[in-house]
Design a protein with these regions (language model features):
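Active-site-flanking structural segment that lines cofactor/substrate pockets
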Residues: 40-60
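Alpha-helical transmembrane segments of multi-pass small-molecule/ion transporters
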Residues: 1-22, 30-34, 60-211, 216, ...
Length: 320
């Protein structure tokens, strides 16, 4: 079975499709907000604990180059997204900066889907990847908002926006989980491992149904964004993702890890970035940045991007 078919025929992706279809047929299906919030807390903490456990048994020197690469791409990706949106997307400064903030950050669920995909393909990635997810979340948002500020865009409170990013649940739970996992190590985490491991994939499937419902709603707004922006919503993740895969391969990451890292870099945030943008760039149009991140790029990565990054990683590995 091809990588594309293998990726599409999986519980995680099909649950996302179920959510989209349910929205399109106007079903009354919904995931109650308390359950959705509980699932997001569970998933984020589980990722952090798993990453922290891996960090505890990984030599620090092995993580230095990937961490520096992550920070570098956290600066490069929002810059490229900003100029592409300005030149090709023909967006104003505020809207371009808002979109760039989303593409400069990371989608945790795209990371999860990519990690599951490479695991099914028999090429699992490095255990410390969750630490890189946390590291990639913030720099791109800051860089994009700086662009808006330097260009004279009228914004809201910077201080409040940065507080939204730094204290948001994704950073608190990912970062907190990483610290707890690192301090405790695999041995002390053994007691809670069954809870965070056994139910993880099932919880992710329910979470994906809710994301499918949200994406289905945003896909209805896709026409307002225009063909030019919709094409950029597919082009940008491929460029960023390929750059991520190439960089990860060059710093010595495995093919599986490089593919997952490419998916991370090629993703667009829909948790941390929207919170910051709403505060710092209140005049930016959500029809652009939310439709592109959740309605276009997220489904694109699930269906096509992840297997593409796997293919690129395998090709680069065979050449080097």
């Amino acid at each position: 079975m091809s990588l594309l078919a293998e990726n599409l025929i999986s519980p995680v992706v099909l649950c996302f499709v179920l959510g989209i279809v349910s929205r399109w047929i106007k079903s009354d299906l919904s995931v109650p907000e308390p359950i959705y919030q509980g699932l997001s807390i569970y998933l984020l903490l589980a990722i952090g604990l798993k990453g922290g456990s891996a960090i505890a048994s990984t030599p620090l020197a092995e993580m230095v180059a990937p961490a520096l690469l992550t920070l570098a791409l956290g600066v490069i990706t929002p810059v490229s997204a900003f100029f592409l949106m300005r030149r090709l997307g023909r967006l104003g400064v505020e809207d371009a900066a808002a979109v760039a903030a989303h593409y400069g950050s990371v989608s945790v669920v795209t990371y999860l889907a990519a990690a599951e995909a490479v695991k099914r393909a028999g090429m699992p990635g490095e255990g410390y990847l969750p630490a890189l997810v946390a590291l990639l979340e913030v720099p791109g948002i800051i860089v994009a908002l700086l662009f808006a500020s330097k260009a004279g865009a009228s914004g809201g409170g910077w201080k409040k926006a940065m507080h939204e990013v730094a204290t948001g649940k994704s950073i608190v739970l990912l970062g907190g989980g990483l610290i707890i996992g690192t301090l405790c190590g695999p041995a002390k985490l053994a007691d809670v491992q069954p809870f965070f491991a056994t139910a993880f994939k099932g919880a992710l499937c329910i979470f994906m149904i809710e994301l499918g419902l949200a994406a289905g709603k945003r896909l209805r707004d896709a026409g307002r964004a225009g063909t030019r922006l919709l094409l950029l919503g597919c082009f940008i993740p491929v460029v960023h993702g390929a750059l991520g895969v190439a960089g990860a391969t060059l710093v010595g990451m495995s093919p599986g890890g490089s593919a997952v890292f490419g998916a991370m870099v090629g993703s667009a945030s829909y948790i941390a970035a929207p919170a910051a943008v709403r505060v710092a760039l209140p005049r930016a149009n959500p029809a652009f940045y939310l439709t592109l991140s959740l309605g276009i790029t997220f489904p694109f990565n699930l269906a096509i991007g992840i297997p593409l990054y796997q293919k690129i990683a395998n090709l680069l590995q065979s050449w080097l």
